[in-house]
Amino acid sequence: MNWGEQVASRRQRVHEQRPLVHHITNLVVTNLTANVTLAIGASPVMAYAREEVADMARLAQAVVLNMGTLTGDVVEAMLLAGKAANNAGIPVVFDPVGAGATPFRTRTAQKIIKELHIDILRGNASEIASIGGFGGHTKGVDAAGAPARVAEMVKQVARDLNTVVAVTGATDYISDGERLIAVDNGHPLLTFVTGTGCSATSIIAAFRAVEEDGVTASTAALAYYGLAAERAAAVSQGPASFQVALLDTLYNLAGEELARGVKIRLL
């Protein structure tokens, strides 16, 4: 089965199995990520009360931890949900929003990674570089040669943390420390709508719920999402119409059209 067929197959699995994805996410993106999760055929739940997060995590097929709007209570809730998911064998996808921006965010990201088993770590290059101890090595990621450095960094962080790392940007890179894959689908309009990175994390979690291999799940999810962004941008006039078109395209994109449009490279 080639990559196009694998992407279409995993997208179909999500549609058929409708996995429940428990989100502890940030206040800015809750509505968009819930709607994206619904549009792809999965079921979102957005529960963050400490009194119920462990119970909710055990009901889910995947758990998303997103530290975008961080408080002490949110950190505690994420740890409770993550430990419950770990004990039940439910995959945890962690989005370390803003890691490296403040000491609190950096410490929190490190604490979550230390105390939980993270199946997939999804972030941008600077967030993952901060977590991996690469400091400012991703400064100027659009400069000549920078994509190669980002790819190497992704593979090294995945190896060091013994997890799957997915870095999203103009090109997405996915690695488990051994395999390294690039996804070239996407569109610049994604950067003009708040929550599109967080939505990528939600889609990865839904795909991981129906696919045991984290590299395959992340690659398929990001190729599908990136192609949907390309199709949505083609019928949009700007960020507002793009957001609506993106939800519609995620809902409709499947099968042969999806398989033919993905741009995936093995590195």
UniProtKB/Swiss-Prot annotation:
Pfam family, one: HK
Cofactor: Mg(2+)
Binding sites annotated in the UniProt record for substrate: 46, 195
GO biological process: thiamine biosynthetic process; thiamine diphosphate biosynthetic process
Transmembrane segments: none
Molecular function in Gene Ontology: ATP binding; hydroxyethylthiazole kinase activity; magnesium ion binding
Gene3D superfamilies: 3.40.1190.20
Protein name per its UniProtKB record: Hydroxyethylthiazole kinase
UniProt-listed Enzyme Commission number(s): 2.7.1.50
Source organism per UniProt: Moorella thermoacetica (strain ATCC 39073 / JCM 9320)
Role description: Catalyzes the phosphorylation of the hydroxyl group of 4-methyl-5-beta-hydroxyethylthiazole (THZ).
Assigned protein family: Belongs to the Thz kinase family.
Keyword annotations from UniProtKB, A to Z: ATP-binding, Kinase, Magnesium, Metal-binding, Nucleotide-binding, Thiamine biosynthesis, Transferase
Pathway of action: Cofactor biosynthesis; thiamine diphosphate biosynthesis; 4-methyl-5-(2-phosphoethyl)-thiazole from 5-(2-hydroxyethyl)-4-methylthiazole: step 1/1
Enzyme class, broadest EC rank: transferase
Swiss-Prot/TrEMBL catalytic activity: 5-(2-hydroxyethyl)-4-methylthiazole + ATP = 4-methyl-5-(2-phosphooxyethyl)-thiazole + ADP + H(+)
Annotated binding of ATP, by residue: 122, 168
CDD domains: THZ_kinase (cd01170)
